[in-house]
Amino acid sequence: MTGRLAIEDVRPRIAGGSQPSKAVIGEMIPVSALVWREGHDAVSATLNVISPTGEVTRTTMEPAPFDQDKMFSSFVPDALGTWKFRVDAWSDPMSTWRHAVIAKIEVGQDEDDLFNDLEHGAQLFEKAAENASKPTAQKLFAVADSLRSNQPLRARVAPALSKEIHEILHEHPVRELLTRGQNHTVLVERKKAQFSSWYELFPRSTGGWDTDGNPVHGTFSTTAKALKRVAAMGFDTVYFPPIHPIGEIHRKGKNNSLIAEANDVGSPWAIGSAAGGHDAVHPQLGTLKDFQALVSTAEELGLSVALDLALQAAPDHPWARTHQDFFTVLADGTIAYAENPPKKYQDIYPLNFDNNKSAIYAELKRIVLFWIAQGVTVFRVDNPHTKPANFWEWLISTIHETHPEVIFLAEAFTRPARLYGLGKVGFSQSYTYFTWRTTKSELEEFGTEIAAMADVSRPNLFVNTPDILHESLQHGGRAMFAIRAALAATLSPLWGVYSGFELYENEAVSANSEEYLDSEKYELRPRDFTAALEQGDSLEPYLGTLNAIRRAHPALQQLRVIDFHSTDNENIIAYSKVDPVSGDAILVVINLDPTHAHSATVDLTMNAIGCEDVDHFTVTDLVTGAQFPWNKRTYVRLDPCADVAHILELPVVEESKRKALSWRTPTDYSN
């Protein structure tokens, strides 16, 4: 406590206030604080919001919906940049007076008993009028006059206790013992940092086959043609694994073989050869000019190109000749290759960020700025948790000084301390453990956690990756692909699909492995998407439906507000999402069993969707268009042979109830 009144536990407050919390333009940001004082006099608080240009707005806070010890409000930023907010506490003499007068009248005290109270009230209303507009001031002076009049007691106080005057005082409070809090920061990014649908493909696999049926190496030109299908499915970010020259020394062969054949293309993550390094493109893909044309084509289709930022090098990367101090040099004079004992990665040299810090920092900044100059504003960062956190904090903040639109996604499958730590130092998005959350209880815990951590980290839920083919997809049949897509597309506003998912690719390299057989990481994998679609053997239409629903419904574009509802079947999960800005509301009910039909009674927590327990309403299934009557307890049946999920449009939440729905019990960000 630093002032006359106590202001504690202000949220959001990240890393002790040393890091900004996260938000995007148009998002409702809930703010809370514990405000208290001695005795029985009422206290209140003001939320002061300072925009990046210095414009200040002030809002009187209210008691939190489910925690009367906390004061609560919110704001919606409308511009990029660093915003600030401050909670000021103050004694609320008007509320104290109001409470005392009502209590005294209720026990039978008369005008004489209340003489001092009435005069004190009149003075308070005159004070409130000092900073009000002329029409409002006239109303407040009239209340003061009424309190001093000779009318019967209840008539004298009626104007002071009216709803209209109460609302006026909320906007024009009398503040005493004002105690200023500390400033806290919020980094506001563009909406794409929070809401986007990603599709991953290897440009080199877009070349099709030759007349003998052999794969042909793709180019940026063939990739541009492939983007039309991606855009038609409703994806808005297309992510390419590294597009740079691939090392030839210790090149990996098919299925991660240590011995490469003459025509093996190697792993794109083994970056660098005689043809160049991180600022070059693979010669077989085309030229830098061809890449620029690809970016332009993507933009015309409504797609952003995301590039892989893999900070490592092949043994024949130019750095290995010109900057050996970027690496760890062993006693025998050789450069240390990557190891994760007992695994060895002879085709990759990891960087040593402690050898020549200034040079390596400058070089990596140059590379990022180089690709920004080519039109890239989204980067998927490979294994950032294996590089120093202070490097990322420096790089991201430095890039954002001149390019605040740039988005960094952390590909970090790691423990919470690292995962959330990367969010704190600046990453806009992160991969998560969604892939391994398959049961109802696991998904409910996961969904609750990602919403609670929205001020720190934004989860991008990929249903598969070139590295990860989960056993549920290997053995769950085609319905499981739809189930996982429905979960990913609705649990988080960020989700992603790696190419081949829509073709139900499910064959692992071996039993108990999550690696794909004939992994695209090591060979060309052209696919005939058109034939599969024509044969009805493709998930493309369903993916397109999911993305269309997401674009149409703000409830699925926000992360903070999600509530899980009770069902009496462990195979049926139900959750609602509400956008507190627009009031848009969605209910999702999914059968988690890909092989059997299941039924359940869904027991809604009605206030979580802005309804009363007695309400009845009609919902529309946004997948099928069917309509159903709905109430607090409703029977559902889902057969994976027909529909794995209901995605239901609920009645729009009344405006007066929306802000309260954004309240969440503050989370401990220390983990």
Swiss-Prot record:
What GO terms describe the biological role, i.e. biological process, of this protein?
alpha-glucan biosynthetic process
What's the EC number here? 2.4.99.16
Q: Is Nucleus included in the keywords of this UniProt record?
A: no
User: Listed GO molecular functions?
Assistant: hexosyltransferase activity; hydrolase activity, hydrolyzing O-glycosyl compounds
- A Pfam family it matches: GLGE_C
Active site per database record? D382 (nucleophile), E411 (proton donor)
Q: Where is this site: Transition state stabilizer?
A: D467
- The residues listed in the UniProt record as binding alpha-maltose 1-phosphate, with positions renumbered to this chain, are K252, Q312, D347, N383, K521, Y522
UniProt similarity note = Belongs to the glycosyl hydrolase 13 family. GlgE subfamily.
What is its quaternary makeup?
Answer: Homodimer.
Q: What does this protein do?
A: Maltosyltransferase that uses maltose 1-phosphate (M1P) as the sugar donor to elongate linear or branched alpha-(1->4)-glucans. Is involved in a branched alpha-glucan biosynthetic pathway from trehalose, together with TreS, Mak and GlgB.
- Name the chain's protein: Alpha-1,4-glucan:maltose-1-phosphate maltosyltransferase
Please give the organism: Corynebacterium pseudotuberculosis (strain 1002)
